[in-house]
Amino acid sequence: RSFGVNPNFITPKNYKFKIKNRAGENTANPHKTELGGMGIFANGVLATNPSAGDHKLPGSTVYPPIGFNYNAVHLGIAYGVDTGGGHPEANGSYHYHEGSFLYNNWHTSKIYGVNSYYNLTNFNEDKFRHIDGHSKIIGYCFDGYPIYGPYSYTTSTDVNTPVIQMTSSYKLLPNANHRPKDFRYDKVVEVEGIGNITLSAGSLIQDYEFKDSYGTLDRYNGRYTITPDFPNGTYAYFLTFEKDDVETRVDYTITIASGVNGHGSGNKYY
């Protein structure tokens, strides 16, 4: 157990989900999602977006401003997010908020050895990529569309174009003018067991804005694309993790669209 100040423990869970398989389709019906699982990964762990909702920051008395949501990934130290990118909630259910598990935890025979899909082919010994470098399916969203790792073709409809890392189209707002005056980027909160935490840029979901074509993906962190699994094309989500010297853009499981349009925790494509 290593969840910092998070007092919760992981307990065994038996999940049974009915998912309508929409892989191979491109049918859109966008809507908000509630807090909770948005999909499930091949290792049985639930996928969620990065929103921690509008509850007070753990170990403190400070709630986010009305209409804002804390970002559990950016504030991972307060939420007890581990090296896999997840943590348990009060009922003992463990879930991922972001994609560290793919490079910190999955490159082991204990994970990819349980499923022949990951063992059949590899790209430079990376068993979570097809032989041409395209990512493999690592889970399914509950709307029925597949979730891939971060690599896909430069041109979504041309397998002969180079494989590149998919990037989010969400960008950190350069200043805190969208926040209330008492919640600027230098806002400091005292957290029990940790000390002072600065609610810097990215601490709130609403610190990000969608910029069309800023990255390779749409506002749901997906796109319609040809893949080795679906040569005729499918809509698919992509797990993205990308950082640079200026800002952390996105290191999340499905989408950072969560909460952008209000009180809800996320958006789905279907």
Predicted feature locations:
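Solvent-exposed N-terminal domain segments of exported/luminal and surface proteins
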Residues: R1-G84
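Generic structural hydrophobic/aromatic packing signal, biased to beta-strands
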Residues: F17-I19, I40, A47, G84, ...
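Extracellular/lumenal glycan-associated surfaces
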Residues: F41-V45, A90-Y103, F230-V250
